[in-house]
């Protein structure tokens, strides 16, 4: 189930994301470092040494796509008029990932690695943690549901 965010939580969520969203390469690097099984799902990166590809153009482009997706979703959250756009984005993510054999467990691994990254790059305290937990609970509720029903 989804729990609405207060205006203060929403503002903190968005402003804190804005402080890290340009660290695309570092975010994806942290996810791959913690989860080689996720890296293995990307044909252009499978089986390659992570440190040797981190500074490549391909890695930068793909990092931008992944982090850009989160930025787009986060930008739309909080305005009920944006729900159709959010649904379209999330349904597209779910169907493209299901087609590539990505499972719920890998989304959960991604989430855990993202939180770990955030906890080291934001002013992490109980308020920040609870805000991100709530926001990601809501986002992943929709993402995992869409993954389940995707064709």
Swiss-Prot record:
The entry's keywords: Heme, Iron, Metal-binding, Oxygen transport, Transport
Keyword Transport: yes
CDD domains named among the record's database cross-references: Mb-like (cd01040)
Gene Ontology terms for molecular function: heme binding; metal ion binding; oxygen binding; oxygen carrier activity
Disulfide bond sites: none
Top-level taxon in the UniProt lineage: Eukaryota
Binding site for heme b: 62, 97
GO cellular component: extracellular region; hemoglobin complex
Family matches, as InterPro entries: Erythrocruorin (IPR002336), Globin (IPR000971), Globin-like_sf (IPR009050), Globin/Proto (IPR012292), Mb-like_M (IPR044399)
Record Gene3D superfamilies: Globins
Annotated ranges, domain Globin: 4-148
PANTHER family according to UniProt: GLOBIN-LIKE PROTEIN
Subunit field text: Homodimer.
UniProt similarity note: Belongs to the globin family.
Protein name, entry field: Globin CTT-VIII
